[in-house]
UniProtKB/Swiss-Prot annotation:
Functional note: Allows the formation of correctly charged Gln-tRNA(Gln) through the transamidation of misacylated Glu-tRNA(Gln) in organisms which lack glutaminyl-tRNA synthetase. The reaction takes place in the presence of glutamine and ATP through an activated gamma-phospho-Glu-tRNA(Gln).
Keyword check for Transmembrane: no
InterPro entries, alphabetized: Amidase, Amidase_CS, Amidase_dom, AS_sf, GatA
Reactions catalysed according to its record: L-glutamyl-tRNA(Gln) + L-glutamine + ATP + H2O = L-glutaminyl-tRNA(Gln) + L-glutamate + ADP + phosphate + H(+)
Record's keyword terms, sorted: ATP-binding, Ligase, Nucleotide-binding, Protein biosynthesis
Domain of life from the UniProt record: Bacteria
Protein name as catalogued: Glutamyl-tRNA(Gln) amidotransferase subunit A
One GO CC term on file: glutamyl-tRNA(Gln) amidotransferase complex
Gene3D superfamilies: Amidase signature (AS) domain (3.90.1300.10)
Assembly information from the UniProt record: Heterotrimer of A, B and C subunits.
GO terms (BP aspect): translation
Assigned EC number: 6.3.5.7
Organism placement in taxonomy: Bacteria, Pseudomonadati, Pseudomonadota, Gammaproteobacteria, Pseudomonadales
GO MF terms held by the record: ATP binding; glutaminyl-tRNA synthase (glutamine-hydrolyzing) activity
Length: 483
């Protein structure tokens, strides 16, 4: 059963080939057996999962239907889950039990999904390798010496290892798409505001967006259907009708205009990944798409702008973790200043402290105009570049990452080298656009992905293209040895 996709599970539950309780039991056994090699879960909610599975079976027996009813899910450990530890991968929240469910968690529970647990992640979602977690690094199932990407590395590794068919993730600068590329999955970052952020512990509020990680575009469509929708509790949620994301998966690509930005193929891109992108473009051309070269002239400034804006917002968001209201509290503080200093110094890891300091510096009186305001101006220019490009093309294609997965620890002493791995993904966050990564082949036995970007609220188009591509390629069906 562990080889089944989410769509196959939906069909199997509907025709009573197996029950949700049987499926849940089998996957929990698999997690217990294999996850010690991967470290993809922080918390496994075995008792709760079996209870939810029995409840889903009862709902189905009573005549209820639904594609997600009784299907398994695990949540990235920054989505609040009532009564279950929500750690954000940090010592700071090691003992935090959420008093309510995040909107995404509540919506999927209402649809009848069974939560198997909470997945490992970079601390407070800050990282591209899942090495900064308080609970230890996550291993890539394709090669246990390599990183799975981040910050949703646990979510990606769990699905890639067939521990379950799909997980939730979040994407602030590529944290769904990059691990999807490095573990041979399909990962979708929706348009900013498409999925509620309520109950999702914030990293950078103007960039964060929740989305699905799964093996196929068809599965991502099913999961996004359950996650998306307006939420009055989230002031950044957009009141936009949610289409049936599965309805147009098989639509023709005849005449589809695809843009290939020349800036994507400069220095820093592994030439073997460039070859995989070109091969994917040829497949889409065979399906009727028309490809033309375009330009995104301000992309070269994206990393600099992102690594000012995101840390600035993080320094503000993380100021609430001070050892007073909640979070780690140091022992025997001498006074309030000592409480703040030691609680935060002990509770936050090195990478989080680094970004808080960068963000605080960028927002300080003497440097606000020089850094933060400039970064926001560049952000606007990047958005304008996309608006102009989408006048000429329907979607944009390119590499998801400049390199395949690297060895654990290889970039640990060089944060800039790790930041540069976000080169192709962060522009979608700065502009608020939807983006999808899909499996596109292998380099040295490690998976690589191709990224698609579309205009606002056109997730359906991305899913359609990825699904049609997956009908004529088999990259997404390949599984790592031993899993």
């Amino acid at each position: 059963m562990h080889q089944l996709t989410l769509a196959e599970i939906a069909r199997g539950l509907a025709d009573k080939s197996f029950s949700s309780e049987e499926l849940t039991g089998a996957l929990l056994s698999r997690i217990k057996q294999l996850d010690p090699q991967l470290n993809s879960f922080i918390t496994v909610t075995e008792e709760q999962a079996l209870h939810q599975a029995r409840a889903a079976d009862a709902r189905r027996a009573a005549g209820e239907t639904g594609a997600l009813l009784g299907a398994p899910i695990a949540h990235k450990d920054l989505f609040c889950t009532q009564g279950v530890r929500t750690s954000c991968g940090s010592k700071m929240l090691d003992n935090f039990t959420a008093p309510y469910d995040a909107t995404v968690v509540a919506k999927l529970a209402e649809a009848g999904m069974v939560t198997l647990g909470k997945t490992n992640m970079d601390e407070f979602a800050m990282g591209s390798a899942n090495e900064s977690s308080h609970y230890g690094a996550v291993k890539n199932p394709w090669n246990l010496e390599h990183v799975p990407g981040g910050s949703s590395g646990g979510s990606a590794a769990a699905v890639a290892a067939r521990l379950l068919p799909a997980t939730t993730g979040t994407d602030t600068g590529g944290s769904i798409r990059q691990p999807a590329a490095l573990t041979n999955l399909t990962g979708l970052k929706p348009t900013y505001g498409r999925v509620s952020r309520w109950g999702m512990i914030a990293y950078a509020s103007s960039l964060d967006q929740g989305g699905p990680l799964a093996r196929t575009a068809e599965d991502c469509a099913l999961l996004l259907q359950g996650m998306a929708g307006f939420d009055s509790k989230d002031s950044t949620s957009v009141e936009e009708p949610v289409p049936n994301f599965s309805a147009d998966l098989n639509a023709s690509l005849q005449g589809l205009r695809i843009g290939l930005p020349k800036e994507y193929f400069g220095a820093g891109l592994d030439p073997r990944i460039a070859e995989r992108v070109q091969a994917s473009v040829k497949e889409l051309e065979k399906l009727g798409a028309v490809v033309k070269e375009i330009s995104l002239p301000n992309m070269q400034h994206a990393i600099a702008a992102y690594y000012v804006i995101a840390p600035a917002e993080a320094s503000s968001n993380l100021s609430r973790f001070d050892g007073v209201r909640f979070g780690h509290r140091c022992a025997d503080p001498k006074d309030l200043t000592d409480l703040y200093k030691r609680s935060r110094g002990e509770g936050f890891g090195v990478e989080v402290q680094r970004r808080i300091m960068v963000g605080t510096y960028a927002l300080s009186a003497g440097y606000y105009d020089a850094y933060y305001v400039k970064a926001q101006q560049i952000r606007r220019l990047i958005k304008n570049d996309f608006v102009a490009a989408f006048n000429d093309v329907d979607v944009i294609i390119g590499p998801t990452t400049p390199n395949p997965a690297w060895k654990i620890g290889a970039k640990a002493g060089d944060p800039i080298a790790e930041y540069l791995e976000d080169l192709y993904t962060i522009t979608a966050n700065l502009a608020g656009l939807p983006g999808l990564s899909m499996p596109a082949g292998f380099v040295d036995g490690l998976p690589v992905g191709v990224q698609l970007l579309a205009p606002y609220f056109q997730e359906g188009r991305l899913l359609n293209i990825a699904h049609r591509y997956q009908q004529v390629t088999d990259w997404h069906t390949r599984a790592p040895n031993g899993f």
